[in-house]
Design a protein with these regions (language model features):
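ABC ATPase NBD Q-loop/coupling interface
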Residues: 68-90, 246
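P-loop NTP-binding/switch modules centered on Walker-like glycine-rich loops
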Residues: 181-185, 189-271
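ABC ATPase nucleotide-binding domain helical subdomain, centered on the C-loop/LSGGQ "ABC signature"
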Residues: 126, 130-145, 152-153, 256-260
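The feature captures the beta-strand-to-loop junction immediately N-terminal to the Walker
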Residues: 40-41
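Charged, flexible cofactor/metal-binding loops and thiol motifs
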Residues: 242-312
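A short, proline-enriched helix->beta-strand linker immediately N-terminal to the Walker B motif
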Residues: 174-178
Length: 312
């Protein structure tokens, strides 16, 4: 199968007080047409920076330090485009849509939500104002905003957090992108609203053929919605597997530690969760071997320096 998106060895750095912080250090992954994948990891693992890097949205003091990004087996490396050039703007929103982490602050408070969606449609699809307005209302209906016609003229602060996130999804899908990146898209919402939005995104993906990358720290979300999972830790991919295989037979000690540390409904009463001792390494001084090595309790720990990233 031809890959829809292929990311090769992407690196992102931040320079602070003379130190180079390698936030993302050689991450590679791929996405197939119509597929939903998950990228999971704890806070600070580099998930969001990876996604921002492939769209060249990293601003100073950060920079994309290397790597390649290809769409549909194309010959052009997206990272070779000028960050603010026309080609990169066509990719952002037009080919790859992104739902950002903060629905409360990602919408412009002085413009109506309808206008913000309409503007995206006019820019990427080339529709006139009236056609773009009709398309924007259609998108609001698609994400189940009640009375979409009148709420086209509402401002962000007139909606609840869950409704704002629906609007963010509508905006990300408005230009009919082939790929949707959902970066912690439901983190600040209650579990019922989370489930509703994730099921809605899954349904929309099936209807439109859109591929989705779910970026989250919540293993339960990717267990239910993703077909494949990439596990990130300290700027690296530690493990990649099909969802069922990863939960049944995790290979890397870090993945095994994560699964031992989360509660499950099927757990017997009184089961004690096992935390992972220690802290992630300083990304400004990360070792050249497996970054989980100092915290690893695996019997294969002595091989970790040789066998990174799979030392389990």
């Amino acid at each position: 199968m031809d890959k829809l998106l292929e990311v090769r060895n992407i690196k992102a750095q931040f320079v602070t007080d003379g130190n180079v912080v390698n936030a993302v250090d050689g991450v590679s992954f791929y996405l197939n047409p119509g597929e939903i994948i998950g990228v999971v990891g704890e806070s600070g693992s580099g998930k969001s920076v990876t996604m921002m890097s492939l769209l060249q949205l990293i601003s100073s003091p950060g920079r994309v330090a290397g790597g390649e990004v290809y769409l549909e087996n194309g010959k052009d490396n997206l990272l070779s485009y000028p960050p603010n050039g026309e080609k990169m703007r066509e990719v952002r929103g037009g080919k790859i849509g992104m739902i950002f982490q903060e629905p409360m602050t990602s919408l412009n408070p002085v413009l109506t939500v309808g206008y913000q969606i309409q503007e995206t449609i006019m820019l990427h699809l080339g529709l006139d104002k009236e056609a773009a307005r009709a398309k924007a209302v259609e998108m609001l209906k698609l994400v189940n905003i009640p009375d979409a016609e009148s709420r086209f003229g509402y401002y962000a602060q007139q909606f609840s957090g869950g409704m704002r996130q629906r609007i963010m999804i509508a905006m990300a899908l408005a230009a009919e992108p082939e790929i949707l990146i959902a970066d912690e898209a439901t983190t600040a919402l209650d579990v019922t609203t989370q489930a509703q939005l994730l099921e809605m995104m899954q349904d929309i993906a099936k209807k439109t053929g859109t591929s989705i990358i779910i970026v989250t720290h919540n293993l339960g979300i990717v267990a239910q919605y993703a077909e494949r999972i990439y596990v990130m830790y300290s700027g690296h991919i530690m493990e990649h597997a099909g969802t069922k295989a990863l939960f049944r037979r995790p290979e890397h000690p870090y993945t095994r530690g994560l699964l031992k540390a989360i509660p499950r409904l099927s757990d017997p009463k009184g089961k004690v969760l096992v935390p992972i001792d220690g802290l992630p390494p300083n990304p400004a001084n990360r070792p050249p071997y497996c970054p989980f090595y100092p915290r690893c309790e695996s019997s294969e720990r002595t091989d970790a320096k040789r066998a990174f990233p799979r030392c389990g």
